[in-house]
């Protein structure tokens, strides 16, 4: 794109493109985007003359077309929801485990916002069989050339022009590819039971386009009904209310509008246990008892979340413990949170992950980032609320405050490593609001939107009146933007209006917080009493003449041990002999907690302990959680003596990984250059 095109789209991205929409008020009401005109005038009064920009529109539009560019509203989506928006999907799948494909039919109910002659959707490696109106009228369509990692633009020609407020129903028959990036097909030997195959999906951020033609952008939310045909012995679950399961057919309904990335499907031979009045846990038989015990407090977490955020609106809150190859700690699919089996620590010490996914029921699922440039609006808010809710479960107010601050300090540790070691403090991906033009959302995934975003909200809370005042703001914010998608400017405008008259707002350096790389400009004054014992022990470990015993850490909580290990990662490596002695005396080698195991393995790798290389490779081969796998592989890569062995191990296991894991690890191991 030319310099003028870049300048235009960067500085007035949404208002300029919306100037093409005749029926603006209708578009605003659908997409939840308001006051674009005011924003346009504010952003451009000292930049370009309005009429010069208007004349440049044709140039920008032509360049989009020539380049096969993605859409104006979302740099990661071909779709054009400012022209027509999907409101409801009727979906059916026939599952073929042998061919590893879904045979699908979708009926899209589309509301027209502009005068249009076609509808544009996202696809990725879909075999489109036919497209027709619901009355049977065949429609012509064209699949654009594939754009690597983004798929192909599907343009569906309408038999006649459609006008604003008109509704269309378009029926599409399609098959997914065996290589669909949203799906992982597991052979029986990759499951706990070793007898039956398994299928699960991961659509976030932009992989829903590989399992159905859709507007694969979080700016669009739709309700859905689904029907899935699978072998009789299999249980089918989705991100929706399960209605009926008769023989080999299961039906679902999701009456709350969701973005495409929250569409989810899992099929396996599963069992369930009741956790509470609105919750079950699902897993393979071999894991069900451990899972039920580990997540027994789910209802307690839900009730604590409701006290802070208001009523839970998704009816049921089930958990599905997936096979180890699942790449995340959890995924907040509505009605059915997906979780990794690495949470089954046997001590409920990783309950914060469940609280995190529960909080997404409000921040992310109800109130959603408009595109993934504003991902912090999902994850930063969720981490912020997660820590408040987890702390609220502690009866003593002082201990509650200390616990919240301690977990915030753990997050700050991880943020510092991400910014200073992994990405680099000058990396544009360390900004809270990133630019995803020519950057895939999977490449932008890091701790930054989680921890920098949460830290920003904590800073605002401390500045603007404390928890009681800020809790009221949060409830107001969640209520106002419920069922909508928004961007950072809209959040900022709402906060400024809510706290108008508060003189301390003038202290906020919005530009540094939102748009500058590196660590945050301000670090809140956290209570450090829970880290004092850890820091004292760290000083002892770093002393040249000292002895160690289990008594040193006997009173530590699992998270204090994690704090200690993270501190050891952040400093110069210890001598191998001292490290081995610590592992024995502190019984770290015996831990079943994966948060402890993975950090200990990293410490050993960084100290070049050859005896632990096999353990590290076995660990990354056994489970696929990227939080663990990526840092270990990066550390192995940095150790030149074992680099080739690490690469060979990855290549041998790549066929068994989910797409997002293999995709990011290839970059970590410099295999995609």
Predicted regions and their residues:
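Hydrophobic pocket-lining residues within nucleotide cofactor-binding pockets
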Residues: 126, 257, 343-344, 605
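Hydrophobic alpha-helical and helix-loop surface patches within well-folded domains
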Residues: 252, 281-544
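Long, ordered, helix-rich scaffold segments
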Residues: 446-453, 470, 478-487, 496-673
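Short loop/turn hinge sites at secondary-structure boundaries
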Residues: 268, 387, 395, 571-572, ...
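Acidic/His-enriched low-complexity segments
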Residues: 2-20, 28-32, 40, 47-315, ...
């Amino acid at each position: 794109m030319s310099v003028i095109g870049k300048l235009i789209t960067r500085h007035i991205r949404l208002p300029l493109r919306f100037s093409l929409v005749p029926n603006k008020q209708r578009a605003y009401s659908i997409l939840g985007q308001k006051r674009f005109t005011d924003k346009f005038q504010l952003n451009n009064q000292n930049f370009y003359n309005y009429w010069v920009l208007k004349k440049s529109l044709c140039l920008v539009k032509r360049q989009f077309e020539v380049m096969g560019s993605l859409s104006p509203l979302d740099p990661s989506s071909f779709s054009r929801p400012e022209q027509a928006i999907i409101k409801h999907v009727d979906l059916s799948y026939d599952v073929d485990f042998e061919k590893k494909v879904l045979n699908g039919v979708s009926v899209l109910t589309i509301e027209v916002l502009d005068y249009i002659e076609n509808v544009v959707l996202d696809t990725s490696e879909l075999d489109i069989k036919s497209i027709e109106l619901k009355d049977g009228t065949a429609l012509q369509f064209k699949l654009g050339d594939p754009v690597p990692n983004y798929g192909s633009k599907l343009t569906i020609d309408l038999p006649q022009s459609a006008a604003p407020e008109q509704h269309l129903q378009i029926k599409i028959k399609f098959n997914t590819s065996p290589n669909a990036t949203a799906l992982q097909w597991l052979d029986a030997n990759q499951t706990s039971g070793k007898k039956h195959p398994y299928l699960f999906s991961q659509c976030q951020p932009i992989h829903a386009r590989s399992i159905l033609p859709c507007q694969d952008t979080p700016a669009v939310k739709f309700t859905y009904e689904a029907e899935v045909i699978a072998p009789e012995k299999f249980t089918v679950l989705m991100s929706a209310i399960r209605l009926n399961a008769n023989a080999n057919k299961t039906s679902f309904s999701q009456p709350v509008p969701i973005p495409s990335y929250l569409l989810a499907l899992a099929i396996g031979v599963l069992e369930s246990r009741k956790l509470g009045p609105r919750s079950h846990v699902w897993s393979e038989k071999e894991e069900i008892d451990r899972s039920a015990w580990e997540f027994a407090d789910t209802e307690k977490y839900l009730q604590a979340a409701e006290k802070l955020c208001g009523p839970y609106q998704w009816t049921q809150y089930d958990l599905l413990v997936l096979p180890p190859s699942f790449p995340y700690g959890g995924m907040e699919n509505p009605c059915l949170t997906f979780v990794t089996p690495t949470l089954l620590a046997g001590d409920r010490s990783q309950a914060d992950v469940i609280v995190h996914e529960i909080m997404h029921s409000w921040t992310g699922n109800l109130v959603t980032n408009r595109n993934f440039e504003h991902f912090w609006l999902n994850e930063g808010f969720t981490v912020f609320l997660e820590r408040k809710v987890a702390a609220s479960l502690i009866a003593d107010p002082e201990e509650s405050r200390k616990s919240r601050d301690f977990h915030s300090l753990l997050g700050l540790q991880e943020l510092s490593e991400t910014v200073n070691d992994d990405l680099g403090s000058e990396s544009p991906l360390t900004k809270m609001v990133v630019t995803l033009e020519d950057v895939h959302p999977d490449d932008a995934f890091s701790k930054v939107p989680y921890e920098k975003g949460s830290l920003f909200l904590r800073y605002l809370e401390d500045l603007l009146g404390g928890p009681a005042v800020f809790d009221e703001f949060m409830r107001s914010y969640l209520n106002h933007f419920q069922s909508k998608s928004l961007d950072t400017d809209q959040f900022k405008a709402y906060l400024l209006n809510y706290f108008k008259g508060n003189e301390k707002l003038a202290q906020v350096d919005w530009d540094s917080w939102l748009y500058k790389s590196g660590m945050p400009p301000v670090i809140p004054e956290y209570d450090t009493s829970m880290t004092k014992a850890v820091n004292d022990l760290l000083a002892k470990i770093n002393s040249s003449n000292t002895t160690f015993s289990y008594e040193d850490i006997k009173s530590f909580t699992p998270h204090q041990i994690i704090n200690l290990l993270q501190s050891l990662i952040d400093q110069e490596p210890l001598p191998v002999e001292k490290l081995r002695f610590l592992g024995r005396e502190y019984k770290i080698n015996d831990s079943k907690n994966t948060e402890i195991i993975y950090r200990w393995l990293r410490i050993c790798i960084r100290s070049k302990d050859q005896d632990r290389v096999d353990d590290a490779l076995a660990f990354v081969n056994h489970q696929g959680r990227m939080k663990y796998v990526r840092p270990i592989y990066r550390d192995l890569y940095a150790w030149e003596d074992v680099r080739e062995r690490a690469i060979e191990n990855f290549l041998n296991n790549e066929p068994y990984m989910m797409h997002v894991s293999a995709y990011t690890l290839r970059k970590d191991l410099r295999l995609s250059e």
